[in-house]
């Protein structure tokens, strides 16, 4: 043994060698916990919270009130989750739960109360796997990353339209109007400060301040004398409160008539009304955090003594304020040791008015702020220049709306920035972004629905004269809730069809984060800055995994350890470090805002047995940069080397040796790996494979601890001595992507199991570890040009031994309808169908399970009534004799689609007679499931885990494959030119380590960023008796000659991807045409043709291939008459007709007609613009045949001997044209 390693156990008894440095790493959490916790929050907190916001519902006349009894909420979900989900999938239903609630109706006149429990809603319920079953399909609701409510200050922001720079502050609520204060900082003139509500026109900031009761003096007193403020005061002409309110009213309410009541209510209704303007707890938290004193008074000098309530001087004038001191001052304001100042000189009528409307006794708190006078620098202190007022909001506020203290603090901060106090915010930082999880998204839908219920209820009450007849049930209609959820799950961008190819893809789709969707960004306008990786993403969002293409950087994935806190911010775990000692006893979860001024070391730092950091100097992360600091200055250490990356990226061994672009492709392609017939765990793993298998919904964990008493392919029974627990296995199920879901038991009768232990292997799982591909012997060498441009050469052995064979399940459905013309009939007697196509049908006309069917075979026999149009003479006679029409039947059977042949594995019949819920007019629906066994073929896409992808170009006989000195043929030959420019060296390291693993009959684990070092691999070469270079002598299988140079050969983990040639290969001989253009349709699904486009036309034009071009653009395309004539003429052996007008020309003419332009084609119109007749020089009188015969003999005709040609000048006549 050459190097110290630990043997770590993974999955079910797999030992792997671990050579990493990391001392103690946090165990990976259950990856689906955040999703499940969020839904749980919705059930227990979100729904009651929504009720509190809408109820009580009070009638317009105030006589009737309907309130919600707290604690009465009851959620009723199906008893057996497995059976309910299975039924929902087969029958195309939604797996849902019922919500019951007790509502109280109160008559204000006589105080009479009536209580009633009602079924409020039935909405989709989350499965244990974090998904929803909607109409039989499994869907996931992805989390959304959006701007956090609160306040965001920005300096020198470039305007999109012009090249001007602006300072601005955005006040963002969760519900309500966005507000903005801004002014231009470029240009020669000092700009006035403006204010904007939503997308309305700009209003002078002074108008807004005046409208909430400020005078010029108060404005100067609080916000200083900056040039911008003085310019704003100088230019502002409206003096009275009413004039300013009127200006704002005209801009915001536009065409509404101005009334006294409207003016009074204007600002309170926009800002202070909780139902119209809501910051939520997150917004209030952000406001209080941003609008405190700390950021602005740090590194300044006090310009006055700070005195306590007891008149004791706490901080003297002239004191230099460090960040620590600033925190102390803020703390003293928080606990009111230093008194807050009352806001003076503000007209309180607006607030009195609001108090009158909302009865909000806390309103008067709004009049207090914390004020500190400071000098920005030493120079201004020595010169005793005018100090700057720093105003912070009341630190103890908890209102969900804006308050006057907030407005004053925001405006103060805005002007403080001009004096270089405070700091501007980064909108792309995770400090200013939050996650809206599934629970909150569902709560939003629930709130919208409750608002509709409130409106409908009030309307219903107002129409009834006798209120005593109304019951709670008759007033509250739950339809809006059902419709709202149905709409959300079926059409929202955030409700997505689950990626179910393999367990990794499934896990990644549940942990996806999108910046798109309602309230998010637009992919067409999103700038580079928004898409880029940000330093705050560390440990929260993966910097690697994101789609290629237009969604890059907008769709992201959570990192392995990230969680979401109560405010919706992503938090990540760390161990605390004090005086070089790491405290492993407690995990600290930090949000991005809490990382300011702290230093973080990586998990791979060497630590001794006493948990003391060994190196004296460390590279640490601090305030968005990397520094080398003393070990004593480290505050925190990462909990794991996988902390930075997502699950998919963490599954790439030697990720640190790959270029990020290729790592991105590698993590995306692993999610597309097809589950193979026999799964095989990788020789070189990263350690996350076991966690993925353990937490994946496609694998089954024991619900209880106990003894296994029964095992078969469909169920496992565990008995704990009290009650046996049945665990149902998924058996030959179709996934969303048509791959196979099959669970195989890994326990035997008599085994003892613990709760939470894996008891089966699902798809792409091997002994409790994720197994997406196969370990195959790979050589990096060129071979007769067959692996040019990333093509892959594979051995026939991989095909024969079913190494890369996968099973795919196609579903075909047929409906039996009842129409006026008659009913569809299920039958085995199908008119004009061949005996071969009916071979597999039973007596009823349904295919027998187990049949091997091929393209065109009938799966379900169905005949439908023919339409009544144009009856034949015979049909008329029959109708006359029998008094009714003899209904003719046409064959409308379900046949195997092109390329979808295979083995029939299941037949599912849904019928209205059996109580199944089918769409209107459908009496029966039959589903046929066909399984295909797909071996690897030329054209299939394969990939490694490092972004090294390619297409199979040739399958060679084993004897032709290059072989090693001992005669072992390689399985795959890859092109070595695919490595240097792509810079994914990880694949080479994996190749060598795989060879070592095979020789030593062991397996390795090499976690990302804590992997096996190259020096260790070299030492392992000695142990395994492998040449130091890792290269071997290779021989050509065809010539038997040795290759000129040694070749890198080893075991690499290769995947077969979902992009298979069977799904893509397509040819058309005859097929459907588009009705409008009369051109063949496009695409495989429609049996379409290959488009001969504009550029292909240019190519033929450039060669002058007129005949080819003519027939391509007419007969073979959209010349209807021409192609029909052509068909007839080919059959009858006639001449090819002349090409007519293509239909697309008529489409163009119709298009122009819609624009009032008449386009006509005139063939040989005999008049010119002046109305004179035009003679066609070729339209000459017919020449008698004897003249032509003479011409043919001696080559001349004396045309002027003929009367008709007397006027013609012989010299100008082209005789060849005349006689042709």
UniProtKB/Swiss-Prot annotation:
BP-aspect Gene Ontology terms: DNA-templated transcription
A Gene Ontology term for the protein's cellular component: DNA-directed RNA polymerase complex
Gene3D superfamilies: 2.40.50.100, 2.40.50.150, 3.90.1100.10, DNA-directed RNA polymerase, beta subunit, external 1 domain, DNA-directed RNA polymerase, subunit 2, domain 6, RNA polymerase alpha subunit dimerisation domain, RNA polymerase Rpb2, domain 2
Catalytic activity: RNA(n) + a ribonucleoside 5'-triphosphate = RNA(n+1) + diphosphate
InterPro entries per UniProt: DNA-dir_RNA_pol_bsu_ext_1_sf (IPR042107), DNA-dir_RNA_pol_bsu_external_1 (IPR019462), DNA-dir_RNA_pol_su2 (IPR015712), DNA-dir_RNAP_su2_dom (IPR007120), DNA-dir_RNAP_su2_hyb_sf (IPR037033), RNA_pol_bsu_bac (IPR010243), RNA_pol_bsu_CS (IPR007121), RNA_pol_bsu_protrusion (IPR007644)
Coiled-coil portions: none
Domain of life: Bacteria
Enzyme class (EC, first level): transferase
EC assignment: 2.7.7.6
Bilayer-crossing regions: none
UniProt GO MF annotations: DNA binding; DNA-directed RNA polymerase activity; ribonucleoside binding
PANTHER family: DNA-DIRECTED RNA POLYMERASE I SUBUNIT 2
NCBIfam families: PRK00405.1
Main function: DNA-dependent RNA polymerase catalyzes the transcription of DNA into RNA using the four ribonucleoside triphosphates as substrates.
Assembly and oligomerization: The RNAP catalytic core consists of 2 alpha, 1 beta, 1 beta' and 1 omega subunit. When a sigma factor is associated with the core the holoenzyme is formed, which can initiate transcription.
Similarity comment: Belongs to the RNA polymerase beta chain family.
Name by which UniProt lists this protein: DNA-directed RNA polymerase subunit beta
Record organism: Mesomycoplasma hyopneumoniae (strain 232) (Mycoplasma hyopneumoniae)
């Amino acid at each position: 043994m050459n190097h110290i390693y630990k043997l770590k156990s993974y999955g079910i008894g797999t030992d792997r060698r671990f050579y990493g440095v990391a001392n103690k790493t946090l165990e990976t959490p259950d990856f689906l916990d955040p999703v499940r916790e969020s839904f749980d929050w919705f059930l227990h907190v979100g729904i009651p919270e929504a009720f509190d916001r809408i109820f009580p519902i009070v009638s317009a006349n105030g006589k009737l009130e309907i309130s919600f009894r707290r604690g009465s909420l009851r959620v009723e979900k199906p008893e057996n989750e497995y059976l309910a989900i299975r039924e929902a999938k087969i029958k195309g239903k939604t797996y849902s739960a019922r919500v019951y609630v007790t509502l109280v109706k109160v008559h204000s006149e006589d105080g009479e109360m009536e209580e009633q429990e009602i079924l409020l809603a039935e909405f989709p319920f989350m499965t244990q796997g974090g998904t929803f079953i909607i109409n039989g399909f499994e869907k996931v609701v992805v989390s959304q990353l959006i701007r956090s409510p609160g306040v965001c200050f920005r300096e020198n922001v470039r305007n999109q339209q012009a090249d001007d720079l602006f300072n601005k502050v955005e006040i963002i609520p969760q519900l309500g109007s966005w507000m903005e204060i801004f002014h231009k900082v470029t240009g020669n003139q000092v700009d006035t400060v403006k204010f904007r509500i939503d997308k309305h026109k700009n209003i002078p900031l002074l108008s807004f301040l005046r409208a909430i009761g400020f005078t010029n003096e108060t404005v100067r007193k609080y916000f200083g004398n900056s040039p911008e403020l003085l310019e704003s005061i100088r230019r502002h002409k409206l003096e009275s409160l009413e004039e300013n309110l009127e200006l704002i009213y005209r801009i915001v309410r536009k065409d509404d008539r101005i009334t006294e009541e409207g003016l009074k209510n204007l600002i309170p209704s926009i800002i202070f009304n909780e139902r119209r303007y809501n910051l939520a707890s997150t917004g209030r938290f952000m406001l209080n955090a941003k609008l405190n004193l700390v950021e602005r008074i740090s590194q300044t000098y006090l310009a006055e003594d700070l005195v306590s309530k007891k008149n004791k001087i706490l901080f003297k004038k002239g004191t230099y304020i460090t960040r620590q001191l600033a925190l102390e001052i803020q703390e003293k304001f928080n606990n009111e040791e230093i008194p807050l100042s009352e806001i003076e000189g503000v007209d309180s009528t607006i607030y009195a008015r609001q108090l009158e409307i909302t009865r909000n006794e806390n309103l008067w708190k709004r009049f207090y702020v914390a004020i500190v006078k400071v000098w920005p620098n030493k120079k201004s202190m020595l010169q005793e220049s005018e100090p700057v007022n720093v105003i912070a909001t009341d630190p103890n506020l908890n209102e969900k709306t804006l308050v006057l203290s907030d407005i004053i603090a925001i405006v103060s901060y805005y002007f403080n920035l001009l004096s270089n106090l405070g700091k501007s915010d980064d909108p792309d930082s995770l400090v200013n972004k939050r996650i809206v999880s599934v629970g909150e998204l569902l709560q939003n839908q629930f709130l919208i629905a409750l608002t509709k219920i409130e409106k409908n209820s009030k309307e219903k009450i107002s129409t009834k004269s006798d209120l005593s007849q109304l019951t709670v049930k008759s007033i509250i209609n739950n339809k809006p809730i059902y419709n709202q959820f149905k709409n959300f799950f079926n059409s929202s961008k955030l409700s997505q069809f689950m990626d179910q190819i393999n367990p990794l893809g499934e896990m990644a789709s549940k942990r996806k984060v999108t910046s798109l969707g309602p309230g998010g960004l637009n992919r067409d306008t999103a700038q580079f800055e928004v898409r880029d990786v940000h330093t705050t993403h560390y440990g929260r969002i993966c910097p690697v995994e994101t789609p290629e293409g237009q969604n890059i950087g907008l769709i992201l994935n959570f990192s392995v350890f990230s969680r979401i806190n109560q405010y919706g911010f992503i938090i990540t775990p760390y161990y605390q470090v004090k005086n070089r000692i790491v405290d492993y006893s407690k995990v600290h979860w930090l949000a991005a805002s809490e990382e300011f001024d702290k230093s973080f070391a990586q998990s791979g730092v060497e630590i001794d047995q006493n948990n003391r950091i060994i190196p004296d100097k460390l590279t640490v992360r601090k305030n968005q940069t990397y520094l080398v600091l003393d070990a004593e200055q480290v505050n925190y250490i990462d909990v794991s080397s996988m902390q930075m990356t997502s699950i998919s990226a963490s599954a790439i061994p030697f990720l640190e040796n790959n270029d990020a672009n290729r790592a991105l492709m590698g993590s995306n392609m692993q999610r597309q790996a097809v589950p193979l017939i026999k799964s095989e765990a990788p020789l070189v793993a990263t350690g996350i494979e076991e966690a993925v298998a353990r937490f994946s919904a496609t694998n089954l964990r024991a619900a209880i601890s106990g003894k296994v008493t029964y095992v078969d392919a469909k169920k496992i029974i565990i008995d704990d001595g009290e009650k046996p627990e049945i665990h149902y296995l998924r058996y030959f199920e179709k996934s969303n992507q048509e791959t196979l879901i099959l669970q195989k038991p890994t326990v035997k009768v008599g085994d003892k199991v613990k709760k939470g232990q894996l008891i089966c292997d699902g798809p792409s799982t091997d002994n409790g570890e994720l197994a997406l591909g196969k370990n195959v012997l790979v050589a990096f060498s060129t071979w007769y040009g067959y692996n040019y441009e990333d093509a892959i050469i594979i051995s026939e052995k991989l095909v024969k031994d079913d190494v890369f064979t996968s099973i795919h399940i196609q579903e075909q459905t047929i409906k039996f309808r009842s129409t006026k013309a008659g009913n569809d009939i299920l039958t085995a007697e199908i008119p004009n169908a061949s005996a071969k196509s009916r071979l597999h049908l039973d007596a009823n006309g349904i295919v027998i399970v187990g049949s091997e069917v091929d393209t065109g075979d009938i799966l379900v026999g169905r005949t439908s009534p023919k339409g009544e149009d144009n009856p034949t003479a015979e049909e008329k006679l029959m109708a006359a004799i029998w008094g009714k029409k003899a209904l003719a039947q046409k064959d409308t059977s379900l046949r195997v689609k092109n390329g979808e042949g295979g083995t029939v594995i299941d037949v599912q019949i849904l019928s209205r007679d059996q109580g199944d819920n089918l769409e209107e007019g459908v009496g029966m629906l039959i589903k046929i499931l066909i399984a295909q066994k797909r071996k690897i073929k030329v054209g299939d896409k394969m990939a490694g885990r490092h972004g090294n992808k390619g297409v199979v170009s040739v399958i060679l006989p084993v004897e032709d494959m290059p072989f090693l000195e001992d005669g072992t043929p390689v399985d795959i030959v890859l092109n070595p030119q695919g490595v240097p420019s792509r810079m994914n060296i990880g694949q080479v390291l994996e190749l060598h380590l795989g060879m070592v693993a095979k020789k030593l009959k062991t397996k390795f684990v090499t976690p990302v960023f804590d992997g096996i070092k190259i020096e260790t691999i070299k030492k392992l070469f000695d142990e395994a008796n492998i040449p130091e270079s890792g290269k071997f002598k290779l021989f050509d299988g065809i010539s038997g000659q040795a290759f000129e140079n040694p070749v890198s050969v080893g075991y690499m983990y290769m995947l077969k991807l979902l992009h298979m040639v069977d799904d893509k290969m397509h040819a058309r001989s005859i097929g459907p045409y588009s009705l409008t253009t009369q051109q063949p349709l496009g695409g495989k699904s429609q049996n379409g043709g290959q488009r001969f486009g504009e550029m292909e036309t240019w190519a033929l034009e450039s060669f002058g291939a007129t005949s080819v071009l003519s027939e391509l653009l007419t007969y073979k395309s959209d010349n209807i008459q021409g192609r029909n004539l052509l068909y007839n003429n080919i059959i009858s052996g006639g001449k090819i007709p002349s090409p007519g007008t293509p239909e697309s020309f008529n489409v163009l003419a119709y298009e122009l007609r819609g624009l009032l332009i008449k386009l006509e084609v005139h063939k040989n119109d005999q008049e010119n613009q002046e109305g004179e007749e035009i003679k066609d020089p070729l339209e000459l009188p017919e020449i008698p045949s004897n003249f032509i015969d003479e011409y043919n003999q001696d080559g001349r005709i004396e045309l002027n001997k003929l009367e008709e040609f007397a006027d013609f000048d012989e010299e100008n006549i082209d005789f060849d044209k005349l006689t042709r």
